[in-house]
Amino acid sequence: MDLLSGTYIFAVLLACVVFHSGAQEKNYTIREEMPENVLIGDLLKDLNLSLIPNKSLTTAMQFKLVYKTGDVPLIRIEEDTGEIFTTGARIDREKLCAGIPRDEHCFYEVEVAILPDEIFRLVKIRFLIEDINDNAPLFPATVINISIPENSAINSKYTLPAAVDPDVGTNGVQNYELIKSQNIFGLDVIETPEGDKMPQLIVQKELDREEKDTYVMKVKVEDGGFPQRSSTAILQVSVTDTNDNHPVFKETEIEVSIPENAPVGTSVTQLHATDADIGENAKIHFSFSNLVSNIARRLFHLNATTGLITIKEPLDREETPNHKLLVLASDGGLMPARAMVLVNVTDVNDNVPSIDIRYIVNPVNDTVVLSENIPLNTKIALITVTDKDADHNGRVTCFTDHEIPFRLRPVFSNQFLLETAAYLDYESTKEYAIKLLAADAGKPPLNQSAMLFIKVKDENDNAPVFTQSFVTVSIPENNSPGIQLTKVSATDADSGPNAEINYLLGPDAPPEFSLDRRTGMLTVVKKLDREKEDKYLFTILAKDNGVPPLTSNVTVFVSIIDQNDNSPVFTHNEYNFYVPENLPRHGTVGLITVTDPDYGDNSAVTLSILDENDDFTIDSQTGVIRPNISFDREKQESYTFYVKAEDGGRVSRSSSAKVTINVVDVNDNKPVFIVPPSNYSYELVLPSTNPGTVVFQVMAVDNDTGMNAEVRYSIVGGNTRDLFAIDQETGNITLMEKCDVTDLGLHRVLVKANDLGQPDSLFSVVIVNLFVNESVTNATLINELVRKSTEAPVTPNTEIADVSSPTSDYVKILVAAVAGTITVVVVIFITAVVRCRQAPHLKAAQKNKQNSEWATPNPENRQMIMMKKRKKKKKHSPKNLLLNFVTIEETKADDVDSDGNRVTLDLPIDLEEQTMGKYNWVTTPTTFKPDSPDLARHYKSASPQPAFQIQPETPLNSKHHIIQELPLDNTFVACDSISKCSSSSSDPYSVSDCGYPVTTFEVPVSVHTRPPMKEVVRSCTPMKESTTMEIWIHPQPQRKSEGKVAGKSQRRVTFHLPEGSQESSSDGGLGDHDAGSLTSTSHGLPLGYPQEEYFDRATPSNRTEGDGNSDPESTFIPGLKKAAEITVQPTVEEASDNCTQECLIYGHSDACWMPASLDHSSSSQAQASALCHSPPLSQASTQHHSPPVTQTIALCHSPPVTQTIALCHSPPPIQVSALHHSPPLVQATALHHSPPSAQASALCYSPPLAQAAAISHSSPLPQVIALHRSQAQSSVSLQQGWVQGADGLCSVDQGVQGSATSQFYTMSERLHPSDDSIKVIPLTTFTPRQQARPSRGDSPVMEEHPL
């Protein structure tokens, strides 16, 4: 489409929009007194008519000013261009709008007709006449006289006559000014409610009539126009005698209404005013104010004496509808009273409507000549009817007296367009005399008439006219050909050959019809089918024989009546529906759609199920099938029935269709793993396995069918190094890379199995535990590792965004868990690094302390000593708690006074069975000074604990680790060629290369006597009530160089343990660091200590995180039963024989106490003896005299257990020299005759293991395997001097006698972080086999040791 065509279409559309209403209004603003030929506006542009091309019009566009004959318009318009100009007529606003209120706008209106007829519109143009300042304000008189009494108070105000300005707005009165007032008077201007400005004279000084009785000055008034206009008047003020009172109107505002036809002399209103004066001053005079208009003064009369207002001349509402009468009441004084009377003139139907004919088509001798072929709606004249009356009296209608081919169409209020309503025909009517009638709505109505003459010019312009403008016929379908439908006819107003008509089918007529040219008969020539075509719409033409011929047409609508000649049709011959088996009863199965080409009742189809099938129902109207049963695919997979469709014809037709309903499976089952059967199974993967080898196959089944049962596998967690891959269809897990050392251990691979169900896939996950190792030597440990590992979250793969659920909530939970795990690991790592850096170096000054004496016990400390402990509540309650009480008794035999008295120190110990392994020994401080020796080694042991029973009286809230502090002169640590520690130093604290900074705590200590026992009792079965074992130890004699008298001392250790701890151990191995915490029943450590966090892989020169001494977070479980006792009291001879080289160098355990100073040369002399509560040794290895042992673990609080052999209760089940739960143990541990390294041993409850052999006089075994505690063995009591060995009972040498002093001590809680002191509590010492002296009042007699 080119630009010109687009412009044309746009112009036509715009013209349709512009002229759709038939009339428009356009407003312009002009100023009064404008000169001639001033351009006001351009209708062609202002009405957007310039977009209409002239070539689309029959004639050129024309603008014609429509005005009343005889009027002189104030504007003119160019007919070709539409430009509006002023004429020579004066535009005077004050004259044109003299009768309207001053606050209303002044308009001048004209009408413009836009021709030709195809775009004809009548435009009413309203000119808003703006006021100019062409009038000056004037006072009502040039001299204004006013009287003021001489007693007027200062600031008294007197109203002056106001000036009048015909202009409005700012051009009106704006300001008053007093000239030459001599400062006696001032002027103020107030504004009345009507908006008028009133001047008031103000008395500014006292007046004295005798001094001066007259003042003359000028008053000036100004308007606000530009240029400003003003006028002046002389103001003469007379000073009069005093007039005390002023008149007062009874009513200051009065509003009355009076009809405009009221006769002259009719009373309008009566004013009343009063004056309190008497005499002449009381006489009141009424008058109109000078603000009252001249018209009001002419129409109304005011009685000056009575105040009665009457009609002076006839009123005319059409001239002035209301009048404002300002009445003044004066008593001769200078302060008249004011009252406003508003007179509303009501309308009376006293005006006849007037008819104003303004021709659009120019008349010739007052007659309009029209051609008979002019188009319809040709505009002839604008008829304006007016009535000066108001309301319904001024509402006028206009009409013609009889039927004529013309009509009046309203365009504006009381304005009508006279236009042709039909084609004119010269042959029928040559002239028209149109009588126009105008009538108002008054009662009675008044009317007016006017005549308008039209003459018709003859032309051949009449076309045939059909008698019907629209022809409608109906015929049933399946008709016989040749049936006549209807006959059309047309007439022609012309005469002669122009009136002869021929009938023709229009070009849109279908071939099924034919038309007789002369008669106009319409006939059907073919059989009709409503289903193919239900209606026909075409035209019939009528053509005359004139020259040129004229034609007309009529539209024919043929409707085909339906017959029931079609049966209902199903959209499918057979319907197959698939429904889920969980579809509820009365749910929607499907929809049967049926169509019927017929119409009405013939197409109203009703559906039903044949054969009385009660399992399903069908909606007879909508075709929705619903079940009356619940589906079960396993019972019946499909249902078949027939549906009947029947229409509603008089002779109904029907059809049927087969319906099959198939019950399909629903994805309501998750895949279930059958391999592995649970998260606790595992598979061994050899490190030598080649990449690409299938190491395991997972298998999951889905109880659904089809795609819902198709399972796909994927690894979604645990495979952080991508060591394994899985086949998503077979479930084969393949090793992707060659395993190295870092890959050894347990791998928890999280495998996800999801089905292919739609729309939602279901899935399950399983943990596949792949144990990368050469063999599985300890299945119990692996099972325990697997069980423990299930409590920790599996690390997700980096590429897996969500392994548990597709929802964002599980993603958030997973991210939070991973972040928390990483945070904990980082904190533990940082803490371990800081603690390791705090390990003190060796202090050489310890060498000077080897010959130090023990601290002298204080015999006065006879009461129980309470020690503070840390109060830290655990976040998670442990599942089981084991409460142990260690009672250390000491008998002094050297002093006669203390004979038979023993001091017993009860130390409560908490043990967690499963949660203890979670305690971090690295981050938990111990009770030792940073540079003190590692005393924890003396109280940690790798020996398993026997089965103990928890008794109700077991105290609550007790710690599960008890550390005995050494005396200031520490004889428990010595230095030689092997040890790096010194036992002699000026420092009051002994120094160990392996010490850790610790936090102290206190425990309660009770002192009581207990008789010694001289036999060794061992229990190999769970203890029912209580079991007591006493081991007497005879320490080695002191070196002669020390010059000390060897005293005899014995040490008694009593264990109070809770009931229920007699579970047997299933595995005696040491825990792997990566294996997770184990239960206390494993007996890897004494008293069921969890092993995984207490010990770690380490070299002999490094401490591990297991070097803590106490667990401040231990808790107790209420409901404990009576405690059992195990008392170990060796004799002096036994103790001396059982002291080993390690006891002489590194200190003594409870079974082996020695004097303070020991000779280094004795380290090669001592032999270790083992007192145990377990069966004999299971194996002994080849003897080696070179010590391969890299590290030795002692009972209770010892360093890492990674390379340790423990006595009692836990022999290795398979391997001889290594415990299965600790990977580095393969290099462990042949026992030897030389002392171990600096970190080798600690104080023990049994002899140190470094040189332990079968307890006999034979050479020590090269390897000693921890004795295994068996549930099947019974309790055996051994006589003094005999123990159970590998080959039976072994003799213990009792010939060595020694003297040793023992000392009790406690650990007090630090009062300040810098306080590293260890408080030593002196207690009474005793000698073994010395009888205790009688006590006084149940309290043993204590005496201080002579040393």
Curated annotation (Swiss-Prot):
Any GO CC annotation of this UniProt entry: plasma membrane
Record-annotated Cadherin domain positions: 26-139, 140-249, 250-355, 362-466, 467-570, 571-673, 677-795
Alphabetized PROSITE patterns for the sequence: CADHERIN_1 (PS00232), CADHERIN_2 (PS50268)
InterPro entries in the record: Cadherin-like_dom, Cadherin-like_sf, Cadherin_CS, Cadherin_N, Protocadherin, Protocadherin/Cadherin-CA
Superkingdom field: Eukaryota
Gene3D superfamilies given in the database record: Cadherins
Alphabetically ordered keywords of this record: Calcium, Cell adhesion, Cell membrane, Glycoprotein, Membrane, Repeat, Signal, Transmembrane, Transmembrane helix
Protein name per Swiss-Prot or TrEMBL: Protocadherin-11 X-linked
